[in-house]
């Protein structure tokens, strides 16, 4: 699917348009707005996670906590109208303002009907219907807006990205100084990065069959392997040399997922 972002005003960028691709590189001199453009991609992927989707759901359900009945246009307008606030959060600048428009190859009138289904006889799972199709979750979620958010974000992510779930990643500029620190920061992009970094350091209780595949790709990319020792992440090269990730963190200036 083509996803276009029409930029009327975004920092130094005016009257421009970009089409999102699976891999994009923004190059040029400092001050051209490369970081702002990359943040637009992160804004979209983060909007398709349950946490931010819950903001949309809570705004639309009103008094009915069990059912959401909107159209895709409602989500698209919410995304466009909240871009300034979210980029301001990432930048730590509450007065940040921009004018952009996300355009999708989806019908604006596509129905988005989400409904929580009551299960009075069991507390071991939850059910929610998405446009009439029942989704079953192997857990009991008392927060019904969260349940609807998870259901809706899975549906829209599959429509937009052709995959129901994904792990978003944010590598902001000058992040190396924050690795290993115990400080907090009001700047959203560093808070997001540190949260994701902590998640990556935490070992999973369930072994994934894809781990070796990913490990092989990482080894090819960095000519070595990633190891975790005493809660710290290191890159170990084939020569045996080892450096902490904090020392290599700025070798890739900035990265956003798509």
Predicted features along the sequence, with ranges:
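P-loop NTPase switch/coupling surface
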Residues: 1-195, 201-207, 237
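Short, well-ordered loop/turn elements at secondary-structure boundaries
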Residues: 20, 164-166, 221-222, 229-230, ...
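GG-anchored amphipathic helix commonly corresponding to the ABC/SMC/Rad50 NBD signature/C-loop
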Residues: 41-44, 240-242, 247-258
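Secondary-structure boundary/capping signal
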Residues: 49, 225-226, 256
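Amphipathic alpha-helical segments that form well-ordered structural scaffolds
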Residues: 170, 213-217, 257
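ABC-family P-loop ATPase nucleotide-binding domains
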Residues: 190-236, 245
């Amino acid at each position: 699917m083509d996803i276009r972002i029409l930029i009327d005003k975004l920092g130094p960028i005016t009257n421009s348009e970009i089409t999102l691709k699976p891999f994009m590189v923004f190059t040029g001199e400092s001050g051209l707005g490369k970081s702002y453009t990359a943040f637009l991609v992160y804004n979209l992927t983060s909007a398709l996670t349950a946490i931010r989707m819950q903001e949309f759901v809570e705004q639309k359900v009103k008094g009915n906590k069990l059912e959401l009945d909107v159209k895709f246009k409602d989500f698209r307008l919410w995304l466009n109208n909240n871009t300034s606030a979210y980029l301001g959060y990432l930048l730590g600048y509450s007065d940040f303002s921009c004018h952009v428009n996300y355009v999708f190859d989806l019908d604006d009138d596509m129905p988005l009907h989400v409904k929580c289904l009551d299960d009075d006889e069991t507390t071991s799972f939850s059910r929610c219907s998405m446009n009439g199709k029942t989704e079953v979750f192997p857990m009991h979620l008392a927060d019904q807006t969260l349940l609807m958010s998870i259901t809706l974000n899975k549906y829209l992510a599959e429509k937009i990205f052709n995959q129901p779930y994904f792990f978003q990643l944010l590598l902001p500029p000058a992040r190396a100084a924050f690795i290993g620190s115990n400080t907090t920061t009001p700047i959203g992009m560093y808070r997001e990065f540190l949260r994701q970094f902590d998640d990556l350091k935490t070992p999973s209780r369930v072994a994934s069959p894809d781990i070796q595949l990913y490990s092989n790709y990482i080894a090819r990319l960095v000519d070595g392997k990633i190891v975790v020792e005493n809660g710290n992440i290191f890159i170990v090269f084939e020569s045996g040399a080892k450096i902490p990730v904090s020392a290599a963190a700025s070798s890739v200036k900035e990265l956003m997922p798509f």
